[in-house]
Amino acid sequence: MIEKNWQELIRPMKPEIEPGHDPARQAKIVAEPLERGFGMTLGNALRRVLLSSLQGAAVTNVHIDGVVHEFSSIDGVREDVTDIVLNIKQIALRMHGEGPKRVVLKKSGPGIVTAGDIEETADVEIVNKDLALCTLDEGAEIRMEFTINTGKGYVPSERNRPEDAPIGLIGVDALYSPVKRVSYKVENTREGQVLDYDKLTLEVETDGTVTPEDSVAFAARILQDQFQIFINFEEAVEARPAEDDKPELDFNPALLRKVDELELSVRSANCLKNDNIVYIGDLIQKSEAEMLRTPNFGRKSLNEIKEVLAQMGLHLGMEAPNWPPENIEDLAKRFEDHV
């Protein structure tokens, strides 16, 4: 059966999100277990797409009143126009709808002009409002009109200044990608008694216009869409086994549930994972004394697990005849509606 090419590969659990110092911009996304070699394959593909192919919005050109070209200076403004344009490139924004759109900034001195001084519209939202653009002296004024568009990747300033552009329109390098940095690492992890599966950790930093978790989801969707063209067959729909076809079990089907499906605290869940306790059937055979010998597992975690098991009519120290079954993963899928 051709379906075995993909159905018999191990599939990772739902990715674990580890927020960074600024959760809206930084996070680690962890996926495990993966077939050996898949960590590098998926990590490299996702990284390339994250950095090159996600849509974003950016300033494409700017007109500053009284300025003829980008090598000018402005009376009462401490920065020259070149520095102002460099700062404009760092504006992070969201655009709702199609571009291009225009927004205006007007301010009088003294004081610092920030991205938050840009007059937002229903279509344009400034994310990093604290970004400094320039500094005005007493009595100085500045007015800037920005053109904003959507795109992907990098577009140089020369392409953002039309040939028939009026004097004073300055092209800006457009950095459309909302993802600023991506790195990944692949480590060994275990599943059951197998020790050489891959664990993929993606470390993603964005400009705040999209979360790291969403950016990875968008990149995965792009890859899914691109890979789809290579599939040249239709999958046969397998009939779901009838109730009478299910094998009789020598134990409670609830034992086939994985412990990571239980609503446990992070500490308790990590302790079980580190002790290679995968299924509830593995857990109930442990005594309280054995559990307390688990590193970082204390009385609070023990009471939490006892309470969860009690709600299922189970407890620690139980016997589970014929556990674990040889085809445990297959049984877990077939009995998933009953556990």
UniProtKB/Swiss-Prot annotation:
InterPro entries: DNA-dir_RNA_pol_insert, DNA-dir_RNA_pol_RpoA/D/Rpb3, DNA-dir_RpoA, RBP11-like, RNAP_asu_C, RNApol_insert_sf. DNA-dependent RNA polymerase catalyzes the transcription of DNA into RNA using the four ribonucleoside triphosphates as substrates. GO terms for biological process: DNA-templated transcription. Its EC number is 2.7.7.6. GO terms for cellular component: cytoplasm; DNA-directed RNA polymerase complex. Pfam families: RNA_pol_A_bac (PF01000), RNA_pol_A_CTD (PF03118), RNA_pol_L (PF01193). Gene3D superfamilies: 5' to 3' exonuclease, C-terminal subdomain, DNA-directed RNA polymerase, insert domain, RNA polymerase, RBP11-like subunit. Residues 251-339 are annotated as: Alpha C-terminal domain (alpha-CTD). NCBIfam families: PRK05182.1-2, PRK05182.2-5, rpoA. Signal peptide: none annotated. Homodimer. The RNAP catalytic core consists of 2 alpha, 1 beta, 1 beta' and 1 omega subunit. When a sigma factor is associated with the core the holoenzyme is formed, which can initiate transcription. Keywords: DNA-directed RNA polymerase, Nucleotidyltransferase, Transcription, Transferase. GO terms for molecular function: DNA binding; DNA-directed RNA polymerase activity; protein dimerization activity. The gene is rpoA. This is DNA-directed RNA polymerase subunit alpha. Belongs to the RNA polymerase alpha chain family. It catalyses: RNA(n) + a ribonucleoside 5'-triphosphate = RNA(n+1) + diphosphate. The N-terminal domain is essential for RNAP assembly and basal transcription, whereas the C-terminal domain is involved in interaction with transcriptional regulators and with upstream promoter elements. Residues 1-234 are annotated as: Alpha N-terminal domain (alpha-NTD).
